[in-house]
Design a protein with these regions (language model features):
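Bacterial N-terminal signal peptides that target proteins for export
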Residues: 8-18
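Hydrophobic alpha-helical elements and their junctions with loops/disorder across both membrane
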Residues: 9, 25-29
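Bacterial N-terminal signal peptides
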Residues: 18-26
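A generic "folded-domain core" signal
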Residues: 31-182
Length: 182
């Protein structure tokens, strides 16, 4: 009888300790995951045209039909040599179009899509905006939101939608601006 009572007490203590540990570790894991959403690359001495790059990977993969694989697009903000202005680009990691420009729908916190013109690089995989009023407006909007939806329609294919978790963006943007202004 006393053994049974002792086992029950020990089990209750173990359960309380487990609950306590989960209360402590879950916020730490959430903070760590928000930190790992963003990666900043300081490329000042690399010889690259891009001085610094802040990037975030999409929440889910998309199909790359050319290579029969799944890929995760990357949203990046960057500055170039000799200019503190910040530009936006999305590396779709798959072919989008052979045209020089494309339209991309940006949905901020569940509102309607706003369609913006983006340039495409020579590979047809990376869409980008030069530092302009639109880039600055978008960056300011990104600071206020947690989730970004982006839609693009590859040449002769149905639209592709990707989502980016922008948690922690504002603080990482400040780090990027600091590197770009040096």
């Amino acid at each position: 009888m006393t053994e049974n009572l002792t086992e029950k007490i020990i089990m209750k203590i173990i359960i309380k300790i487990a609950c306590f540990l989960s209360i402590i570790t879950i916020p730490a894991i959430q903070i760590q995951s928000q930190e790992s959403l963003w990666k900043i690359y300081d490329q000042r001495n690399s010889g690259e045209n891009e001085v610094a790059l802040l990037s975030n990977t999409s929440e889910a993969s998309i199909n790359n039909l050319e290579h029969s694989e799944k890929v995760f697009p990357e949203l990046s903000l960057y500055c170039e040599e000799g200019s503190p202005n910040i530009s936006i680009k999305i590396n779709w990691k798959r072919y989008i179009s052979s045209f020089n420009k494309t339209e991309i729908g940006i949905k901020i916190d569940g509102k309607n899509y706003t369609w913006l013109s983006f340039n495409l690089d020579k590979t047809g995989q990376i869409s980008f905006q030069n530092p302009s009023t639109h880039s600055n407006e978008l960056i300011n909007k990104f600071k206020k939101i947690k989730k970004l939806a982006v839609e693009i329609e590859p040449y002769s294919e149905p639209p592709i939608n990707v989502y980016f978790n922008l948690s922690g963006f504002a603080s990482h943007l400040e780090n990027l601006k600091s590197i770009c202004s040096q």
